[in-house]
């Protein structure tokens, strides 16, 4: 009996060790699931933001900003700014393998509204690839590759940064021809991310790396310096219209 009792105690001790060794294994599995969920959530947060690029593959297509503003479970919301239009969209986002796949639709009350289908790789959330199809036959379908880029106002970019950084004098503009004056004035708007409705204005700025279409209304974003400079430039544009070739250099 003296031998048996210590033997029983030893066996019970071994069983207790084996039971304890199994518990951490279950806890580890649970923590992996939690970490995976957190990783997915972080990936969702990483894809929120603006993606910018050419909307189409024809060589003369407009630059687009696609803004993902909200993700709630599998619901996604945002808006696009392109060709002078600012349109909302909403839809679904699902994880498939290494990608987030999005199907989203614009409201449908504009003749150029349509449906987006695009994907973002979980390991490269700086790039978005997809296509868009119009609801009506008012325009052609588009394919696109967009890159994450945050809009930031910078008064110092462009050919005529002085129009945003200091008050202009008459000597700054009196010898400029109308095309130069027009460019100087519209460059102020471009710095604020204004999405031009006129095709010729879009062509001037959309190939510039610093230009990011961000809004169709910039009235509340212009600085006091810029407002005064715009008024001065407009006056000289009117002079150029009146005097034609005799005006400017």
PLM features per residue range, with description:
Residues 2-9:
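Sec-dependent signal peptide recognition
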Residues 18-20:
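Bacterial signal peptide processing site
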Residues 32-124, 138-145:
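Central antiparallel beta-sheet cores of small beta-barrel/beta-sandwich binding domains
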Residues 131-138:
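Short, exposed beta-strand-loop hairpins at the edges of beta-sheets
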Residues 138-162, 167:
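Pro/Ala/Gly-rich low-complexity, hydrophilic intrinsically disordered segments
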Residues 172-214:
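Amphipathic alpha-helical packing elements
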Residues 196, 203-249:
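Compact alpha-helical subdomains of small soluble proteins
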